[in-house]
């Protein structure tokens, strides 16, 4: 991961990310089944191009994989809400219409997210969530990267955060989430806080 800066200007720089080989990309057959909405497909696929979510929102059901392909830019919010066994993979981007979280993981269990680029990715009242090779970039106030609220067994591995607030913060009961947080691991991470703290 590189930051290309001209004359020391860190606010108008270019971020270059080198990704590992994508081992989660679905087969062409699986993609075609998803695009045709064939019965039995548990894949939601976003191909290269711009995608505007209906009502700016996608709630991911349990047992579903969302794949955001390289070159895809999804506008809106992707939620796992009260779900389990959810995967969000890819090399594309998710951005809300304006400020806020591109992906929200709430009251869910067994969620894995790999490779995508988001504005923010908070985790609230969850168990067993793993983020690998995820990039979070925000430029606005209160633009925390990957906050963890009242959650257990959370791994942030190989993530990159460039945020205009805390990059990663761990909280107990707050913002409508109840309970403590435990077994939260941040490793192999690059945390670049323009404001506030890399870890709070």
Language-model region placement:
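An acidic-aromatic substrate-binding cleft motif
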Residues: 22-48
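Glycine-rich phosphate-binding "P-loop"
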Residues: 97-103
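N-terminal extracellular ligand-recognition/capping segment immediately after the signal peptide
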Residues: 41-80, 92-94, 118
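Beta-strand-enriched, solvent-exposed domains that form extended recognition/catalytic surfaces
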Residues: 1-32
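Conserved mixed alpha/beta catalytic, RNA-binding, or beta-rich assembly cores of soluble enzyme
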Residues: 77, 146, 185, 197-200
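Right-handed parallel beta-helix
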Residues: 63-65, 70, 84-95, 109-119, ...
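Short, T/G/N/S-enriched strand-turn elements that build extracellular solenoid repeat scaffolds
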Residues: 31-37, 52-61, 75-82, 102, ...
């Amino acid at each position: 991961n590189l930051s290309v800066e001209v004359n020391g200007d860190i606010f108008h720089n270019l971020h270059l990310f080198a990704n590992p080989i994508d081992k989660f990309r679905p087969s062409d057959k699986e993609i075609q089944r998803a695009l045709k909405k064939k019965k039995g497909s548990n894949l939601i696929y976003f191909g290269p191009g711009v995608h505007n979510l209906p009502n700016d929102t996608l709630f991911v059901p349990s047992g579903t994989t969302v794949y955001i392909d390289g070159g895809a830019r999804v506008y809106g919010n992707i939620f796992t809400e009260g779900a389990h066994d959810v995967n969000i993979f890819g090399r594309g981007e998710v951005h809300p219409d304006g400020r806020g979280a591109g992906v929200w993981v709430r009251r869910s269990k067994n969620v894995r997210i790999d490779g995508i680029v988001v504005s923010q990715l908070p985790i609230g009242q969850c168990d067993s969530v793993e983020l690998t090779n995820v990039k979070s970039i925000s430029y606005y106030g209160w633009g925390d990267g990957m906050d963890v609220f009242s959650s257990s067994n959370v791994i942030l591995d190989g993530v990159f955060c460039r945020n205009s607030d805390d990059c990663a913060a761990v909280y107990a009961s707050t913002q409508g989430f109840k309970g403590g947080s435990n077994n939260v691991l941040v490793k192999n991470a690059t945390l670049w806080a323009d404001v506030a703290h890399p870890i709070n």
